[in-house]
Amino acid sequence: MANNYFQFKQFLIHQRYCAMKVTTDACLFGAWVAERVGDCKRVLDIGAGTGLLTLMVAQKTNDAQIDAVEIDSEAAKEAATNFKASPWNERVDLIRENIIKYKVGDLYDFIITNPPFFNNDLKSDSNKRNLAMHSEALSLDELLVSIERLLKAGGLFAILLPTHRSVEFEGKALLAGFYLREKVLVKQTPKHPPFRSMLLFGHEQVIVTESELVIKENDSYTADFIALLKDYYLYL
């Protein structure tokens, strides 16, 4: 059973009611994204869940305004609680809304998303977990339409996907006018196949940077893993 909370160095994530708990791959993605947000002033987190990604980015930015959109009522309440208790409460906002219907005046410089996974896999008995884990509620096509509508010209977006779905998404993104800039394949160990892909897209075509990130080797965290998460994890 997952813990009801996850303590980071500078913030706490309550996760009693949110269907999707803090995971290692989500933490890696949050840290990786936070290094790429840079001086962006307006950031959007689509499908915020507990607010993990929002707070990881907030920790690494000085004055970025981060809006977190979440459709599930219990997850939204928990994210709002996590935001209020954080050191960055004044510049992180929780918006309970369907991203398809979400409207905003000023477009975003950077969009991050850890969308529903496993649309073809066996569903669980929990409706909330199904909503979080399956893509019937928000398809990749609908996600891309929302990103295209909300991202300003010259902006970037980053997405975490199961590796077996990344090629499909890259094709869809290209048709929507987005070019892949970076791709990181995440592996549990050197002997395991990649299970997650961290992808960065923009409007301009560039030479794609591709790499691998291994979480553990010889039962210890790798140097790459530690470098990304040492500012977040308590015991690194």
Please name every model-derived segment:
Residues 2-42, 48-59, 214:
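SAM-dependent Rossmann-like transferase core, predominantly class I methyltransferases
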Residues 14, 67, 93-95, 181-184:
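General small-molecule cofactor/ligand-binding pocket signal
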Residues 115-142:
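Mobile active-site "lid"/loop adjacent to the S-adenosyl-L-methionine
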